[in-house]
Regions:
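Transmembrane alpha-helical segments of multi-pass membrane transport proteins and ion-pumping complexes
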Residues: 14-26, 44, 48, 52-53, ...
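Entry/N-cap segments of selected transmembrane alpha helices
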Residues: 6-22, 67-71, 92-127, 202-220, ...
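Structural signature of hydrophobic alpha-helical transmembrane segments
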Residues: 3-17, 68-85, 137-152, 208-220, ...
Length: 319
């Protein structure tokens, strides 16, 4: 349990992140730029690159090294990105996405395989350049680097499209679907790599992961989607509004996010699929979507993107 001083430090950190993110997001919006640019830049300003270099004492006060406070902040930012992908999923037009599934798939394969092959080849032939340890398996290390280079920044892509009002467009959906397919492939490969590093059988692990993930997507987008479509009118009219429907969306989103995280695939994929399944319902009111959108994109999402900037230390990385 956090004591009084840790609670104070945590609240100061959150308040500072939200304040600077909002100010810089408004500046970017004024110049017709996506607000995410301001939010990430806010993290860079507040992080070790700027504030930490100019005023180490102030940086240590605003973002203390206390492990408990750090853990809580990491938990909040993880929750934030899960909620963001849930909201992104609500905006996806499933029928339009299915019509352009081939374009999304081929784009994803091209966009994933090129950086994977390049990263694998470089890491395999020049492992010292990537800091490979002497005891590391060269094949596993090269697979790891190739996979890391092939995974896109899905939350950043999604938020940028949302800020530019392109999320519901044809090109926006193809971009989102391509990034989603590519990242799914990347996380599945990561689960195989972890199996190769341990004592389990990578082949069995890969087959199980693909089977469970494929089953999850099919179940969520066919029978569960239909059940949700029938349940939403009841939730929006018979239970306290908007509390009832919001609780339902978040509970289902968090449970499915937990499931995909347990599979070894990132939690954001479970949340995104739930968002798609719920958002496809004709009964989900625009008011409900707007409440979710405003709540997540103005409170939680900025915390996640600021946290990205906070992890950047240009002086340390390029020294």
């Amino acid at each position: 349990m956090l004591h009084a001083e840790q609670i104070t430090e945590f609240l100061i950190s959150i308040s500072t992140m939200l304040l600077v993110a909002r100010v810089l997001a408004e500046v970017c919006t004024h110049f017709n730029q996506p607000s995410i640019i301001g939010e990430i830049f806010a993290g860079i300003l507040l992080g070790p690159t700027v504030l930490g270099a100019l005023s180490p004492d102030l940086f240590a006060y605003v973002f203390p090294s206390d492990s408990a406070v750090k853990t809580v902040l990491e938990g909040i930012t993880t929750l934030a990105v899960v909620m963001l992908l849930l909201v992104i999923g609500l905006e996806v037009d499933l029928s339009l996405l299915l019509r352009h599934r081939k374009a999304a798939f081929y784009t994803s394969m091209i966009g994933t395989m090129f950086p994977f092959v390049l990263g694998f080849a470089l890491a395999y032939h020049f492992p010292e350049m990537f800091g490979a340890g002497g005891n590391a398996s060269l094949l596993v290390f090269a697979l790891f680097v190739g996979t890391a280079m092939s995974i896109s920044a899905l939350p950043v892509i999604a938020r940028t499209l949302m800020d530019m009002n392109m999320l519901k467009s044809q090109i926006g959906l193809i971009i989102i679907a391509s990034a989603m397919f590519g990242d799914l492939l990347g996380w599945i490969i990561f689960s195989v790599i972890l199996g190769m590093m341990g004592t389990g059988s990578p082949g069995n692990q890969l087959g199980t992961t693909i089977l469970l993930l494929g089953g999850f997507v099919l179940v969520m987008l066919i029978p569960v989607r239909r059940l949700i479509n029938r349940a939403i009118p009841f939730l929006q009219t018979k239970i306290s509004y908007p509390g009832g429907i919001l609780n339902f969306i978040f509970i289902l989103g968090f449970l499915c996010a937990a499931f995909t995280e347990w599979l070894g695939v990132h939690a954001i994929f479970g949340a995104f699929i739930v968002g798609v399944a719920i958002g496809d319902s004709a009964h989900l009111s625009e008011k409900t979507k707007e409440i979710l959108h405003q709540f997540v994109t103005n409170i939680f999402a900025p915390l996640f993107f600021v946290s990205i900037g906070l992890k950047v230390d240009f002086f340390a990385n390029f020294s």
